[in-house]
């Protein structure tokens, strides 16, 4: 009989219950116990959904109050020593301070989890880091599931991936792999505690196997799993996000009891594991996208596998379902307005049922689920033949693009002269990244407008009032290049998707980005174009309120692609270029309307990189081409900005330079300007604005901290090409800390300008 198991589930709840409870707790509106009760209820619901899909093992240990890698830092005693906290007795309040910072310490750095848009908290490893086991997080969840009468499989990120996703810190140079001998015994203690609590199987996830690992890291797997094999539980080694075929010989030799492989991202790797003689878990339902599977097609893969493997075949999603929205069935508007599209989709709960159908088809025969298989086939056929998806005019515009269509008219050296001639900016020009606080009033007005309780004219008036406030406050602070604050935007991607053709939206399709921050990605289901101007009216209104330059604000094509659920019937590169041409129409309209500083945000450029370096060039070529297409045809005097965050840039700087933005602003404060060093070494040719304070925390930095970062930046970047700005947009902050933070930034800027003028 084929076994069905799960690797992980969304944590926030069907209606973001965890988010709202967390934020109430942070505002001291509910007690810790009330927050714990919400979390326990969500875990139980998740397990019951998995059980309802006839799962043989539900996933435990995947639920977290903030981030599963932060949980692992606590479990291994690897929390940053700079906080002075005891990982053995860590109150929830201190757990959140690790993630969000406090008055004495900045938050743990955050970056993307492999090539997803989920963020994890980066472990800080020092040469003298000591580890200490605390298995409470995993054991408690295991026991909770057992109390419900469920068979549960704890899921823990493995030791090599844990070290791989961390960073070396401190003044002593060392390789974090050298910490492995100290870390391994702690893992043994954690796994032993789980065995003692009744775990039969434990899933140890090693997604690092899907990247280009150095030889010494690959070789370390032998000793690691020889050691972990001494624990009496059965180990399922989990891999996902890409192919691990190159490590097939190693993986077949490891003393584990089973292997999970991602057959959605890398179906071709199955051949490499044809002779595997242990449990093989086939990840056949997409854990990262929202398209319904053609179950008959999936059975063409897993049917023959079952014939070969028998009871050694397990099935699951490709990876944790963390990356998918919770439940399609609550999307009543989508069902009413786009019934065909609705029939092509599957969210987390629907994916659990797809797995239930597959298990039944394998174990009881296809006739037992004939109706479900027929419905799956009908949806696949409908999507393949839909006239809603393909547009001849969009295809023709792409086909007719000349070579080098995105090239600016002149090189940067000439453009910057034309720009400074009218901008007349001081040394160390200051700006904001884009958004200002999304207040309760803004959200209430938007909600009332969407419900039809507020007229279009009243909504516009409310947003204009907010824009006027943002402009006024920036002028008071004496910022140089202003932003309008994006009051009218619910989300930097969703806003544009709602105004572009080929996109669709959900009401409750939220996925976790980090902590309590959730995003609701648009669905790109068809060819993309821009029916009418999207931002021009708001930007020109803001520009008319001030004599200072006002930035037009657009989200770039790669980021819109990366932060959407993308159609999987044509290449992603084609979709991206379609978006770029739609944005180009907007850029040229902004320019005509007198907006001569235009920011095209690309925070997601790096997360689109394939996990294997051999595939990078192809991606970077079409990503860079798409960015250039979006600003094609601009005058030299129009200044194009871009913004990138949470990124390691060192290895893609030539590609970033080839994007040829006049100004790039980057997130650097959490890494103490570490990321900026690469730009200096590369001699990045255009203007740079490194973030001088962290906006992800409500903490107001001291002037000394901001000055320290800005002086470090001046050491790296020629001062005439250096801008001063926060790390990122200010949407999630409150007004009080926003103004205090910006005031600190401006005070330091004025001090250094005066010093440099001497």
Swiss-Prot record:
Residues that, per the record, bind Zn(2+): 643, 645, 667, 728
What are the alphabetically sorted keywords of the record?
Amino-acid biosynthesis, Metal-binding, Methionine biosynthesis, Methyltransferase, Repeat, Transferase, Zinc
MF terms per GO, please?
Answer: 5-methyltetrahydropteroyltriglutamate-homocysteine S-methyltransferase activity; zinc ion binding
Q: What InterPro entries does the record point to? A: Cbl-indep_Met_Synth_N, Cobalamin-indep_Met_synthase, Met_Synth_C/arc, UROD/MetE-like_sf
Q: Entry cofactor note text?
A: Binds 1 zinc ion per subunit.
The residues the record assigns to binding L-methionine are 433-435, 486, 601
In which residues is 5-methyltetrahydropteroyltri-L-glutamate bound? 16-19, 112, 517-518, 563, 607
Stated EC number for the protein is: 2.1.1.14
Query: Record's NCBIfam families?
Result: met_syn_B12ind, PRK05222.1
Q: Which family does the record assign?
A: Belongs to the vitamin-B12 independent methionine synthase family.
Can you say what this protein is called? Answer: 5-methyltetrahydropteroyltriglutamate--homocysteine methyltransferase
Source organism (scientific name)? Neisseria gonorrhoeae (strain ATCC 700825 / FA 1090)
Q: Which gene encodes it?
A: metE
